[in-house]
Amino acid sequence: MRIILLGAPGTGKGTQGKFITEKYKIPQISTGDMLRESVVLKNKIGMIIKNIIEEGKLVSDEIVCHLIKNRIKKHDCINGFILDGFPRTIQQALYLSKKNIKIDYVLEFIIPHEYILERISGRRIHIQSGRIYHVKFKPPKIKDKDDLTGQTLITRKDDTKEGIKKRLEEYKKVHDPLVQYYIHEKKRGNIKFFQIDAMLSFSSIRKKLETILKK
């Protein structure tokens, strides 16, 4: 089962991806996590990525495709994987096709952009595990502490109002053409494409996902 998750920052696709991972035992490959891990390594490519992210721009297709190609070769992807945050552009989608990387499902999470600012600015992250909380919608049991480890939660540097607006502007430029590409692929019978209302409750979305992934 090979799945692509689409959706603007703050739609909750990462959280739902974790649910799919736990239920179907396939890894969730987050390009955001991969990019941040590269930055932490402080190697040549990591420093390039760091500068791009701090400017609020999107990392080039060449860099992201290189990271994805190496990741899906690993043994834990033998039964499938979830791509979270990839592809972001038509070029990245065509890269998958060119490399004969078969995708079964494309799931797009939809939410009005006016709600995204509130969702993202309230996010708190457990950096070691990737667990995501929200001060309003999904608060930790103890303020600013991870439920399982008790370690301190952080706010991403680019989760400021200015950073969020920049990311949404960049996202809009490439999102619509990408969705149209996958709608076309659905009509050709190459993939199964579904749009999901991300304003629904977590449990409602999960039930919907279970129904979709049985098809």
Swiss-Prot record:
Molecular function as annotated in GO: adenylate kinase activity; ATP binding
Gene from which the chain derives: adk
Keyword match Metal-binding: no
Family that this chain belongs to: Belongs to the adenylate kinase family.
Organism name: Buchnera aphidicola subsp. Acyrthosiphon pisum (strain APS)
This protein's record includes keyword Cell membrane: no
SUPFAM superfamilies: P-loop containing nucleoside triphosphate hydrolases
Protein name (database record): Adenylate kinase
Subunit structure, interactors included: Monomer.
Catalytic activity, EC: 2.7.4.3
Function statement: Catalyzes the reversible transfer of the terminal phosphate group between ATP and AMP. Plays an important role in cellular energy homeostasis and in adenine nucleotide metabolism.
Residues reported in the UniProt entry to bind AMP: T31, R36, K57, L58, V59, G85, F86, P87, R88, Q92, R156, R167
InterPro entries the UniProt entry points to: Adenyl_kin_sub, Adenylat/UMP-CMP_kin, Adenylat_kinase_CS, Adenylate_kinase_lid-dom, P-loop_NTPase
GO biological process: AMP salvage
GO cellular component assignments: cytoplasm
Binding site for ATP: G10, T11, G12, K13, G14, T15, R123, I132, Y133, L200
Domain of life according to the entry: Bacteria
Cellular location(s): Cytoplasm
Key words, A-Z: ATP-binding, Cytoplasm, Kinase, Nucleotide biosynthesis, Nucleotide-binding, Transferase
Domain comment (free text): Consists of three domains, a large central CORE domain and two small peripheral domains, NMPbind and LID, which undergo movements during catalysis. The LID domain closes over the site of phosphoryl transfer upon ATP binding. Assembling and dissambling the active center during each catalytic cycle provides an effective means to prevent ATP hydrolysis.
Pfam families recorded: ADK, ADK_lid
Region ranges (NMP): 30-59
